[in-house]
Amino acid sequence: MTAAAPLILVVDDFLDNRQMYAEYLAFSGLRVEEAENGHEALEKAFAMLPDLIVMDLSLPGIDGWEATRRLKADARTKRIPVIALTGHALAGHSKGAMDAGCDAFITKPCLPERLLEEVRRTLATFQHEH
């Protein structure tokens, strides 16, 4: 019996982006769940304990920054790696994302291949460390 494929939670309020990333990751053999805002991301993360979260930082309501801080502050989810996705390419945003607890940072627009590469790299790093 083989281990289940890693579960990835893709969080983006823009439906087209979310579906594109989710479909590409699923096509690549990963299990994928989707959330459209920070509140839903927190609910699903606590319920499902995904192996990795792809988090858009610009979300309505609870934004990706705050959702990541809450995930990293909770014992149940603090070890789940978070890849930040943002349309802001400023250097300060990547530092801010890391300060919030993100483990990697990708600027949008982001090709699905680039996201998959970062997901695989981050999963490998965390599986090796934990």
Language model segments and positions:
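Active-site beta3 strand of CheY-like receiver
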Residues: M48-V54, L59
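C-terminal output helix
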Residues: C110-V119
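Charged docking surfaces used in two-component/phosphorelay signaling
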Residues: Q19-F27
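Short hydrophobic/Thr-rich beta-strand motif most characteristic of the beta2 strand and flanking loop
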Residues: G29-E36, K44
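The feature encodes the CheY-like receiver
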Residues: P60, K78, L90, P109
